[in-house]
Swiss-Prot record:
Known EC number: 2.7.4.22
Name this polypeptide is given: Uridylate kinase
Lineage: Bacteria, Pseudomonadati, Pseudomonadota, Alphaproteobacteria, Maricaulales
Entry keywords, A to Z: ATP-binding, Cytoplasm, Kinase, Nucleotide-binding, Pyrimidine biosynthesis, Transferase
Family note: Belongs to the UMP kinase family.
Gene that encodes the chain: pyrH
Record localization: Cytoplasm
Length: 263
């Protein structure tokens, strides 16, 4: 049974603290845009360092962590294709952007003493390991953070789908999606103040209402493997720790109702 994450503003530990982790192993999906901070392009080192500290605290608390980072802060394949580029070539460029972000996050984590491995779906052994599932699992069992780069290694698949695939392969208890807002809304709350916010959603509700928190293939893969998706604000201080402890403001997506009721 899936339990909702509750808002810690009502009860729980004091500010700046969080309870014991509720998940043994999780995949954290971070958008490339999240790494920009207040910049319009590229990687903001202060933002990468802050996210690294959150991940380090989670590992220290006993949670096994793996990450998938998008590449939209550097290059987005769909945008390139929309401007006339060959879609496959544009997607490969986007995959290379995720490798750059993964290396930046690895550097941020290792700078604070967290052993980290980058595994790429596109082999580039000079800079990182190739993706090998059993090796990635062993890394996490030894307390290392694993960052999966280059998406699925195939064009026409998003990094959301790559995150869902890796979460299923790694046997993760949840996929945590760190975004720019504190959950799933009916519309972009930054442009529509009347957008409805959801605390809980069924997988099928996300698909039938076209809420676009993740692409349909990613949500379907999570549904088929019964892995909950937790959407939270990656920029909120201690946001990751609170979500891992079953607290904090977020949206939980999972098996909330029967398939017949969800349609």
């Amino acid at each position: 049974m899936l339990h909702a994450v509750t808002d810690s503003s009502a009860s729980g530990p004091a500010d700046g603290q969080a309870g014991a982790p509720k998940f043994r192993r999780v995949l954290l999906k971070v958008s490339g845009e999240a790494l920009m901070g207040s910049q319009n392009y590229g990687i903001d080192i202060d933002t990468a360092d802050r996210i690294a500290r959150e991940v380090a605290a989670a590992v220290k608390g006993g949670t096994e962590m793996c990450l998938v980072i998008g590449g939209g802060n550097i290059f987005r394949g769909l945008s390139g294709a929309a401007k006339g580029m060959d879609r496959a070539a544009a997607d490969y460029m986007g995959m290379l952007a995720t490798v750059m972000n993964a290396l930046a996050m690895q550097t941020a984590l290792e700078r604070i003493g967290v052993q980290t491995r980058v595994q790429s779906a596109i082999p580039m052994t000079t800079v990182c390991e190739p993706y090998i599932r059993r090796r990635a699992t062993r890394h996490m069992e030894k307390g290392r953070v694993v960052i999966f780069a280059a998406g699925t290694g195939n064009p026409f698949f998003t990094t959301d789908t790559a995150a869902a695939l890796r979460a299923a392969e790694m046997g993760c208890d949840a996929l945590l999606k760190g975004t720019q807002v504190d959950g799933v809304y009916s519309d972009d709350p930054r442009t529509n103040p009347d957008a409805e916010r959801f605390d809980q959603l069924d997988y099928l509700d996300v698909l039938t209402r076209d809420l676009r928190v993740m692409d349909a293939s990613a949500v379907t893969l999570m549904r088929e493997n019964a892995i909950p998706i937790v959407v939270f604000d990656i920029h909120k201080t201690n946001g990751l720790a609170r979500v891992l402890a079953g607290e904090g403001k977020c949206t939980m997506i999972g098996k909330m109702k029967s398939d017949a009721a969800a349609v």
